[in-house]
Curated annotation (Swiss-Prot):
EC numbers, comma separated: 2.7.1.33
Family to which the UniProt record says this protein belongs: Belongs to the type III pantothenate kinase family.
Binding residue positions for substrate: Y87, G94, A95, D96, R97, S169
Catalytic class of the enzyme: transferase
Keywords: ATP-binding, Coenzyme A biosynthesis, Cytoplasm, Kinase, Nucleotide-binding, Potassium, Transferase
Pfam families membership: Pan_kinase
Active site location: D96
Protein name: Type III pantothenate kinase
HAMAP family attached to this UniProt entry: Pantothen_kinase_3
CC annotations in GO: cytoplasm
SUPFAM superfamilies: Actin-like ATPase domain
Pathway where this protein functions: Cofactor biosynthesis; coenzyme A biosynthesis; CoA from (R)-pantothenate: step 1/5
């Protein structure tokens, strides 16, 4: 069987490649405890392992030790699987973003702004021809809140909720950080649509996608595990 790995900043997601159109079952493991992955690979040794990683080389080595064989780590290229990379240095694009775009282009082709809301917030523009125009990277919600707490003497990291007009610091921090994420998403959708001269779709992925969807002024579609979907497509072909 073929094993797919999405090694993110905070955890590892993994799945066995499903046959045909079936959706793969996704598992998640913290980087400090890969026992479940190791046990699964002992029971069913993978014949091939494909992965996309944005984590450290030390963690990548630990992952390879757990699976018991070398991992084919995805390296972004100038083009692959119908997607064209706009980066000046294509291999400097994050492997997770590259896999997500391949997954999005094949799962739901069309003009779209692809948002991944996790540790970082990435906003990428992908047209219906598979051309990646470029994108932005910013701190995610958790990083924004923690950086504010660490950079100030008295604000701390209180639990708050989003309010239109916050009347306390906890809600003010949460609302301000969330607004700092939704505004650039809305702006990029408008900008890309104007550039193309036609409507574009908003695709949301990542752990904070449901929260963002609740507070965006535009509609978006949440699509889970696009990195693994992109890897699954690549596993069925060669670039």
């Amino acid at each position: 069987m073929i094993l797919l790995l999405d090694a993110g900043n905070t955890r590892l997601k993994w799945a066995w490649l499903a046959e045909g159109p079936a959706r793969h079952t996704v598992h998640a493991s913290p980087h400090h405890d890969l026992t479940a992955l190791e046990q699964a690979c002992r029971i069913t040794p993978p014949r091939r392992v494909l992965g996309a990683s944005v984590t450290s080389s030390e963690r990548n080595s630990a992952i390879m030790a757990a699976v018991g064989r070398p991992v084919e780590w995805l390296v972004p290229a100038a083009s692959c699987a119908g997607v064209t990379n706009a980066y000046r240095d294509p291999d400097r694009l994050g492997a997770d973003r590259w896999a997500q775009m391949i997954g999005a282009h094949h799962e739901q082709p069309g003009d779209q702004v692809l948002v991944s809301a996790g540790t970082a917030l990435t906003i990428d523009c992908l047209d219906r021809e598979g051309r990646f125009w470029g994108g932005t990277i910013a701190p995610g919600l958790g990083l924004l809140r923690h950086s504010l707490a660490e950079g100030t003497a008295r604000l701390g990291l209180p639990d708050g909720s989003w309010q239109e007009y916050p009347d306390n610091s906890a809600d003010a921090i949460f609302s301000g950080c969330l607004n700092a994420l939704t505004a650039p998403i809305e702006a990029q959708v408008a900008r890309f649509g104007s550039q193309l001269g036609r409507p574009v779709r908003l695709t949301l992925a990542g752990g904070d996608a449901p929260l963002l969807a609740q507070h965006l002024a535009i509609d978006g579609t949440i699509v889970d595990n696009l990195v693994l979907s992109g890897l699954a497509h690549l596993a069925r072909m060669s670039c």
